[in-house]
Structures are given as C-alpha cells and as structure tokens.
Amino acid sequence: MLITHLIDSLSDRAVITPLTPTSVIIYDKNELKVYVGFTNNRNSLEYTKEVVLLLSTEIPKKAEIREIIVSKNGDYVILEGPRSLFVVRIGAEILVAKPDRLPSECFCECYPLHDSLLLQNISLSVVKVRLLPEKCDEKTFVTAVLFSDNCIRFYNLQKKFDSLLLAVDFRNHLHQVHDENVANNTFGLQKALVSFDLIPPKPNTSHFSIISIDSDCDFYTSFVHFSCFKEGYAPRIHRIEPVDGLPCDPLDLRYIQTTNPRICSVFVLVSGGGVLSHLVVFPNEFGEFRFLVKDQLRLPSSNGDPRIVQNQIRSLKVSRYEIATSSSLFSVNIFPWFEALTSISPTSTLEKETRVSELVDAVIPSDELSNTTKWTGARALRAVSVQLTQSLATEEEELLPESENIMHLVILENKDGQPAHLFNISTFDNIWSTENKTSFGRDSVSQPPMKSTGSLEQQLAALKPLAACVISEKVSCEEAIDAAMKFFDAVDERLKKHCEISKLFVERCLAVSSSAQALDEKQQSVDQRLIEETNTVEELKIRMHETKERMEGARKGINVLFHRVDENVPLSDNEIRIFERLKEHQKMLSDMTKLVPKMTLDSNEIHRMANIVLKKRGTGEEQNRFAAVEKNATEIESLEARENKLNTGISELSI
C-alpha cells in the first residue's frame, strides 16, 4: 500500500512517532494505529500492514494529544496532551511478529495517568514528559512528568492506580533571594521550569540524576536514589551557578546518548531562533555537577521553533540526534569532539567540531508539485525516521553485508492546506556506524578501505626456492655464461624482493614500536590514576574511621541523655522536637556506621585489583619480532656466497 494514501488521509492534528526501528505509531481522529514494513519500491514508499489498536479505555474526543512518547523497547506508549496523559501497553505480538502475520486489529490496555490531579486543579497543565530508559526493578518502570506548578512527579507505569512514586518540588528554588522584608516586583513575569531530562543510571548502580532548566536559563540538579521511591522522601535540589554564553529563551533540554557515559554526560539546549547549545556535564566528588558549554550552532532561520525528533534506530541516536525546523530536517553528529574529549590518547585533539547534515529539504521544486511550497506554520515539521525492509535493497546495496536503509520522512502542507510529504533514503553500512567516515545524504556512499600490502608471512611463504644453476663439461662456454647470467638475474630479483620485504618488516617494527610506546604512556597514565585513586580511598577511609569514632561518642551521649529522662516527666514541645531530631541523628549515625565497613571492603578490592594488574605487567615477556628478519638475512648471505662461487668458476672456465 502506498504511503501517499496514508499521508492524504491525515489531518492537521495527526501525531506520528517511531514505535520500533521498523514501524511507526500515529494518533489521528481519535484513533491509534501502527504501520509496519516500510519499503522503497522504485522511489515510491509503501507499507506492508496497518494495525488498528483497540484501547481498553477510550480516549475522549475533546482530548488534545500533541506528542507520543515511546519507551526504549516500544512496550509502553504515553499520549501526552496539555490536560491529559494516557498510557498504552503495546503487546509483544506487534513488536516481534512479522508484518504479514499481524492482524488488522489488536487489543491494547490503556489507562489515564493521574487524571485526578488534573481534574482537581483546572489551571494545571503538562509541560514535559520523560521516560527512564532502564527499569528500577522488575515491578517498577518510571516516567517523570513536569507540570506547570514547577513540580516533577514520578510514576510507575506498571500500576494503573496509586502509581505516584515521588514528587520533587522546585518552587522554593526558583528564586535565589528569600528575604521577606524585601518586596520583589517581577512585573507580572515569574520564573518557571520549561524543560528537564534524566541522566540514566550507570550499570550496577541504583541512582539517576535530574537536570532541569527554567525560563531564565538557570539550571537545577537533583540526585535521585531508587530508595526514594520506596521511602517517599524527596531528594535534595542543587542550584547551579549561571552558565555564561547561553541564550535567555530556552525551549527544550535533551540528554544525548553517548558511547562513554561514565566520564561525562552531554545535553543539547534548544533555544529560540534555532540556537543549539551542547553542554558537557561533569559530576564532582560532592554529587553535584559542573557545566561546560562545548559549542553553539545556529540553524537556518525558519518560521517557528525547532523541535528534536524522536528516534528508535540505535545507529542514529548514539552521539547524534535529529532536529526539525519548519523547512528542513537536520542530523547533528557530536561523535568527533566527544570521542576526542573522552580519549586518553596523546594524539587526540579537542579542536574537532560538530557535524550538521541536512537530511530533507522541504522546498519542493515547482515542476514536481506546482501547488506545494514549504510549510509556513508556527510549528516544526512532522518528521520520522524508519528502517526500511532489508530484503528489498538494490543490487549495489546488497554488496554491503551489514547495510541499513533509513527512510527520513517529512510531512508538510501545500497552499490548499492538504498534506504532502518528502522523503530521503540514506544507506549506513558497518564502516559508517563504527568509524563515522561518511555523511548523511541522498547518495551516501561508503569510502573504500585502504589498500593493504598483505601479510608479510604470506609473502614469505609464497617465495619458492631458486632453481639450481648446474654447469657441466658437456655444455659450451656460451651456454654456461648464458645460464649463469640468467641465474644472476633471478638472484637480483630475489634480492630486490627480500629488500622490499625487509623494508616492510622495518615499517611494521616501527609501527609496533610506536604503538608500544603509546601503550606504555597509557599504562603509565592508568597507573598514575590508580595511585591517585588509591590515595584518595585511603584518605577517605581515614576520615571515615575518624567520623566513626565521633559517631560512637555522640551515640553514647545520646543514649545517656535518653536514660536520664524519666518517662513520666512531661516534656515541652521544644524538648519533644529536640528528642525527635536526636532520634533522626542517631539513625543517621547508625547508617553511617554500616557504610564504613563497606568502604573498607571496596578499598581493599581496589588494592587487590591494582596488585594483580601490576603483577601481570611485570611477568609479561616481549616476543622476538625480528626472528623473520634474521632468517631473511641468513638466506641473503647464502645467496651471496653462491654468487661469489659461481663468479670464481666462470673466471676459471674463461681462462
């Protein structure tokens, strides 16, 4: 079925988002549909199957849906509107089954998310919704919602009722001055949070972070532990010092998935006027963050504000993202400077820049669509990227064993208000995805690999022994001289070949030597970092033991104080409050006492691993890399001896 018919049937309020790398989900006219199996048949886009999702809870016709948020695996879908939030659970048969085996209709569970909060407060609205990529546990799948009351609320999507886990209130932190004696006049304008995003938890950790931004471009961070959801206490909020050089009209803040998130995190700040600011966030030893503005880009001027496009294709969302304006769809690649930033190689440089490629231009030539111009509305293009079916690739693309055909589809409007579409197909192979040597484009072609000289061992094995030059008495003098000259020519050719191979061996040895030197420098830097970390752990352990002693003394004093107080003696409110505070401190001291042995075990484990690494490096034996060169030198000497012997025989024969 042609995708043109699908585009023509969409209304101006249709919302389209990728569900999986090979399928999209569309909400339009109070219906939720999934389209799978996209192919390119002679420059005409087609889809294989249309699946209508029958929801258990019908979405009201008056509900306005402006965005669809999809989980990492596509099993949860959130329909977001200014005054509504609906959660849809997608069945596994839609995500796994082949397109031709899917039914035309499929039942899905649907339920509203905290609708009572929106019904009780008429002025409350939804600002942003974010999903935590990883589950906290088997029964908790977390989503965060920013409401207009400057509160971020966390919900468990696996619960229909009582799904609220935690609420983080930023209202008391939006204003730096809290002096009641000073009257603050904001002239009717008040600060409010405009966007936020989550830093996913690292492997084998049980915490994540929140980075939020308000209308004055001030940042706020919070460190959330999974235990906060169970115990119900809000985390501490840190206000970040103002970052210089950022625009004062922020629109959206997004976390960018990178190849090495352990060292730092990268965010993109979308501001008015099409300005993109890439922020590198470094955590410090106190659990806070330090912001660094890496670079800033300005997209071509267009009507409306740019919008980041969701993507489910891994090769297009790691160290890169897509952003749509009212006239074009762009791909932004931060891999060059991020790889240089996180690399410890001495040859790396930090002068590399962000790469921006235009995927689709919404200006259609007049000879193709005479009634179509670029979209002139106040919002960004509706864009989506989907992986095409691999089996229908062209003959040239089949030569690449691990190639992917990605369709970038853009939906716009013509003069008559009817929907139109443009698309671009890019081919990404294994070379592009690993080395990032090609760029986005309609005619994207991978660069050929460098010409290899082959294995030196194979070249040596291919050399056959020279035929013996036998001169008997029955052979005439001229024939003997001719045979000897041919043998000398063969010897010269063999000598030249051995010289070339020797040069290649020398070049390889130099390359190995330089690599070994670079590896040695890396090992020294790692050793230095291990020593620094070990010293830090030792200092921390000493401080922890000192703290433990102080805690023991404080605990004894608290216990003595508790025993001195008679239970029948009435206490004042201040005394009761003091004793409650003392109990809290006693609990905190007990928790800190439990942490000291754990820190000791961790430090001992680091010592043990460092000793193992040093022992392995000390017992390593260097292989003899010049054995083949010595063997070739011996063969060359034998050939020279045979040549001298033949010269002597020829001189005696001529005499």
From Swiss-Prot:
Keywords: Membrane, Transmembrane, Transmembrane helix. It comes from Caenorhabditis elegans. This is Protein npp-24. One of its GO terms (cellular component) is membrane. It is found in: Membrane. InterPro entries: Nucleoporin_Nup88. The chain crosses the membrane at residues 263-283. It is a single-pass membrane protein. The keyword Oxidoreductase does not apply.
